[in-house]
């Protein structure tokens, strides 16, 4: 009987010990889970912080890109305007210089018209002026100065200025029959219109402009 009682007590002791072991195991497991959840929570917070920092960094990068782009565009505009200003200044200076040269050309042409090329006493003068004029015209031609000498051409109000109209059986109506003064174009821009007499055709009355 005593043996049965002892066994029963031993079983109770064993069950109690086993229960304590299970309880401790459950406590440890619960602690581990709580610790893991805490670590996961901290990790999530850290990830959110890093994502926010990355977003801010990307925003700053985009802002810097915009600043660089605007600065580059501004510099390009400044360069373009400077180039345009230089070009305008160059054209203005060239145009002013060309305008100063036109009377010189006109005077040499008038000198040729008023000099007898066949007379011995004036032949050398004529040839000298003619050679100088050709050289002069050739030089200014290199800078884009072209003469407008429309004799026999149709009247063009964009390049010609009519000083009058006359009947002419030789020239069709609205044709330049005489060039009173040559015009000039500088780099495709009209510098001075040609002063011309325009034909009315085979009949009509003289009309002065």
From Swiss-Prot:
Cellular localization per UniProt: Cytoplasm
Main location: cytoplasm
Composition bias type Polar residues, residue spans: 1-13
Example GO molecular function: protein-folding chaperone binding
GO CC aspect terms: cytosol
Alphabetical GO biological process terms: protein folding
Subunit: Homodimer.
Biological role stated in the UniProt entry: Participates actively in the response to hyperosmotic and heat shock by preventing the aggregation of stress-denatured proteins, in association with DnaK and GrpE. It is the nucleotide exchange factor for DnaK and may function as a thermosensor. Unfolded proteins bind initially to DnaJ; upon interaction with the DnaJ-bound protein, DnaK hydrolyzes its bound ATP, resulting in the formation of a stable complex. GrpE releases ADP from DnaK; ATP binding to DnaK triggers the release of the substrate protein, thus completing the reaction cycle.
Family: Belongs to the GrpE family.
Name of the molecule in the record: Protein GrpE
Organism: Shewanella woodyi (strain ATCC 51908 / MS32)
Gene: grpE
